Amino acid sequence: MFEQKHSITLLFNANKVYDRRVIAGVGDYLQTSKVDWDLYLEEDFMARLEHLDEWSGDGIIADYDNPEIQAALQKAKVPVVGIGGSYANPADYPDVPYVATDNHALVQAAFEHLRQKGIQRFAFYGAPVNEHARWAQERENAVLEITRSQGYECYVYRGHPVRPETWQYTTKRLADWLKSLPTPIGIIAVTDSRARHLLQVCDHIGMIIPDKMSVIGIDDDELARYLSRVSLSSVRQGCFELGEQAARLLHKMLKGHNPPKKPILIAPECVAERQSTDFKAISDPHVMQAMHYIRQNACRGIKVEQVLDYVGVSRSNLENRFREERGHSIHTEIHNEKLQRACKMLENSNEATSQIAKICGYPSLQYMYAVFKKHFNQTPKEYRDAMKNNDEEDSLVLQVS
């Protein structure tokens, strides 16, 4: 028996990464189920919200974090499924079937990741109160509840909107806040965009990441990942599942089933761990300074002598400090940093191996081949193929239970 054909409107901003992932989840449900839907996705749907009641389709899946969309759909004559953030107060949920990203679980995952690194101080970089971003306040409330319940103090700063005309003022205020914090400290940012702003300001004021401040964002936005010198750790939201579950829910409603009375909460996918939270409790300030320089410059082909010049101590002095703190030499630290970068690029990019060798500071492709043979008994190509054939997540991606 064939499914009845339906016309479904998606009210999302396809220019946003979060929305695109949700839309992809809806599309995947179409591909894997028997639904026969025509999907309508307008680029400028906000300009036509007032005429939504004239639409003669069969169902709507919409971004209910947007108050204008909520208002426009109050008198909708077709089944509506809302997608948005979760709320601690059940009374805050809209009066429609609702699929929510679990804000408390997102913050919990970020907090646990930092605590597992041995971090004992916490801060939260949020966002100004905004009716279009109520999820930001929910995440702030969640981090305060979690840290207090575990016996930790949490420093909170909402900051200001980041705009070109107020950039200097906003950056100065953020820098002042960062300088006031005790270190070492772990900072949870409300989004990857705010986390990237943190990393930029830390770089400007000479705050060492992650030794003094470990930073983790929320979204795992690829753009934010590549726009900072230090790669950003982030909690990956279950956006794909949000879309998939919303489509499944609407499908059931169109078949006459009653929707659930409670919202469906979607947990985060995982924590993608990168340099910004690669915290190791280093007490020696000279080693900490050297580590910062090595992270920033290892792939530029630096030698031990340049590290010594940067730190300003003798080789024997710094080598002894390194062996005590890190268990190996300065040269090994440089080598490990380059190798780790090469491994990540082989796993996560489609760059040619020759280009990766160049980017990671190896004198030649043949040299990188020799390094991989020595460490993994594989060529770079064999290493890449093995990683792609591995069904398990990258060893630097921690699954959230």
Describe the predicted segments one by one:
Residues 235, 377, 393-395:
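Residue-level signature of transmembrane alpha-helix interfaces in integral membrane proteins
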Residues 329-332, 363:
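Recognition helix of helix-turn-helix DNA-binding domains
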Residues 368, 392-399:
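C-terminal end segment of the histidine kinase catalytic
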Residues 322-329, 371-383:
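A secondary-structure capping/hinge motif
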Residues 1-59, 69-310, 315, 319-320, ...:
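Bacterial carbohydrate/catabolite-sensing allosteric modules
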Residues 305, 331, 354, 370, ...:
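Residues within the helices of the helix-turn-helix
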Residues 332-334, 383-385, 397:
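Short Lys/Arg-enriched helix C-cap and helix-to-coil transition segments
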